[in-house]
């Protein structure tokens, strides 16, 4: 990013991105993270150090990259109308890929539940016609899962409140609503961790357990990412970065999209994995 650039003198509305080290550095950081993750799963020597280095490297690269994007929008005013449109399309496509991810998890769950004979029948003991397997003690869907459903539905309401407050140029209500949404996200994650801790089955306890932890755990990771996203928006809102005109509030808009997506996915998980699956 060149601080001496003067985008006002451009003869077009598009953003020609300056050379950046973050894409390639993020790629190497992700490689380190994957190596660390595999090493941790297999118990290799120094696995925790490699995994920690990968997490820190990815976090630093993403922070630095997004910091530059924010500066390009606020300081350099590079986020013109065509650029904002392109960013919105990119975010929509990203959410579409996430839908495909969860679609695969649901397909695996339905394959196992509607026809409970696993492909790895010799490894995982699954009795035909019985779902969930008799060795699995499932969760009561109207205990912690129902509470978590109410938490996420309420958080969807508060993030919408924050959006409307921003549109009305009410910074105080916007910041308050974002703070409530963040607290609800943290509460959800805490309840999910409590549920996992007291679960009667492990990830390796068969096809039901692997499907359950993969789907709900992947969603839980998205809640954590979304909460971090909202925390960044909270501090930016307090600083007065978001407006209703000009460069607008793309960061907040994308965080709200992402959070609503997480809410909808949980409703499907609650309905099919917890209620139908039990």
UniProtKB/Swiss-Prot annotation:
Compartments (UniProt record): Cell membrane
PROSITE patterns xref list: COX3 (PS50253)
Membrane topology term: Multi-pass membrane protein
A cellular-component GO term for this protein: plasma membrane
Domain of life: Bacteria
Catalytic activity: 4 Fe(II)-[cytochrome c] + O2 + 8 H(+)(in) = 4 Fe(III)-[cytochrome c] + 2 H2O + 4 H(+)(out)
GO biological process: aerobic electron transport chain
Enzyme Commission numbers on file: 7.1.1.9
Molecular functions per Gene Ontology: cytochrome-c oxidase activity
Main enzyme class: translocase
Regions that span the bilayer: 21-41, 46-66, 89-109, 174-194, 212-232, 256-276
Keyword Translocase set for record: yes
Signal peptide residues on this chain, from the entry's feature table: none
Keywords in alphabetical order: Cell membrane, Membrane, Translocase, Transmembrane, Transmembrane helix
InterPro entries: Cyt_c/ubiquinol_Oxase_su3 (IPR024791), Cyt_c_oxase_su3_dom (IPR033945), Cyt_c_oxidase-like_su3 (IPR000298), Cyt_c_oxidase_su3-like_sf (IPR035973), Cyt_c_oxidase_su3_a-hlx (IPR013833)
Family: Belongs to the cytochrome c oxidase subunit 3 family.
PANTHER family: CYTOCHROME C OXIDASE SUBUNIT 3, CYTOCHROME C OXIDASE SUBUNIT III
Protein name per UniProt: Probable cytochrome c oxidase subunit 3
Species whose genome carries this gene: Rickettsia felis (strain ATCC VR-1525 / URRWXCal2)
GN (gene name): ctaE
